[in-house]
Amino acid sequence: MFYKIAQKVMFQMDPERAHNLAIGSLRMTGNGPLNAFYAQNITPAPVSFMGLTFPNPVGLAAGMDKDGESIDAFHAMGFGHVEVGTVTPRPQPGNDLPRLFRLKPAKAIINRMGFNNKGVDNLVKNLIAKKTDIMVGVNIGKNKDTPVEQGKDDYLICMDKVYLHAAYIAVNISSPNTPGLRSLQYGDLLDELLSAIKAKQLELADKHKKYVPIALKIAPDLTIEEIENIAQALIKNQFDGAIATNTTLTRDGVSGLANANESGGLSGKPLTELSTKVIKQLATCLQGQIPIIGVGGINSAEDALAKFDAGATMVQIYSGFIYQGPKLIKEIVEAYRLK
């Protein structure tokens, strides 16, 4: 009931202003008595993923809490993990406003945020300050003004700084809103990046006597051949996990709607089938060697179950969480326990 009232108010506001207000409110209430307005008890449904044990298979996707400001609040809601970021080595403002659009009839969102964040040093401070022991993944990317050819340096800088504070690290090369970023998904650039990241992971594991798993987040706009090539690169470089998928550049299912022609990545219900298809293809290519987090268009427990059936070990929600609220977490966990 509380979420429906809050949502009604928020949906009258500019989407980015509403988002910032929500994150700010959650930051202030996350670990105090006011979190009773959204906290919920969820029956544990432990799942093993990348050598880690999560209390349940439902996580918050990257992009919601870029700077790790409201982690404790999302823990109170019952998420099994939170993925913060995307974070870059240096702070950056992101793309020009407006850059976030609701497509309410389709339960969808278009964004062209452009990795707006306060930088990796600020994120680390927030990770240290969090009060709860929730599993936190850190999604890392490159700064907009870093040439693609030097992009791996940005990922390595972020790895160095977040390594001791992350349950796992997610490598984002699939956002459509940073020029040239998706080119890192192909050919020599992909192999060079994954090789460098794996070498850095092993170096840090030896230095700190702690192994932090690494996952790669991929786009939904890939051919089967491109998916096969990514799978082979993941296996070759001994990555620990994959996250499928990011937002799509397609506009299937939103034609004619207000804001449908805005540039950026489309998320939400129109992405459901495409994301599930990519998960299934990726799982087939990986042959059980590397586990997958399924994300993209999960608007119901049934959508999540389809991701599990396609080969995902865990799932993440974002747009569906905005449209459905925290109850979606509980519904998915209950369905998972019964499957």
From Swiss-Prot:
It is found in: Cell membrane. It is a peripheral membrane protein. FMN binds at A62, G63, M64, D65, K66, T86, N139, N172, K217, T245, G268, G297, Y318, S319. PROSITE patterns: DHODEHASE_1 (PS00911), DHODEHASE_2 (PS00912). GO terms for biological process: 'de novo' pyrimidine nucleobase biosynthetic process; 'de novo' UMP biosynthetic process; pyrimidine ribonucleotide biosynthetic process. Binds 1 FMN per subunit. PANTHER family: DIHYDROOROTATE DEHYDROGENASE (QUINONE), MITOCHONDRIAL (PTHR48109:SF4), DIHYDROOROTATE DEHYDROGENASE (QUINONE), MITOCHONDRIAL-RELATED (PTHR48109). Belongs to the dihydroorotate dehydrogenase family. Type 2 subfamily. Monomer. Catalyzes the conversion of dihydroorotate to orotate with quinone as electron acceptor. This is Dihydroorotate dehydrogenase (quinone). It comes from Shewanella oneidensis (strain ATCC 700550 / JCM 31522 / CIP 106686 / LMG 19005 / NCIMB 14063 / MR-1). The lineage of its organism: Bacteria, Pseudomonadati, Pseudomonadota, Gammaproteobacteria, Alteromonadales. The gene is pyrD.
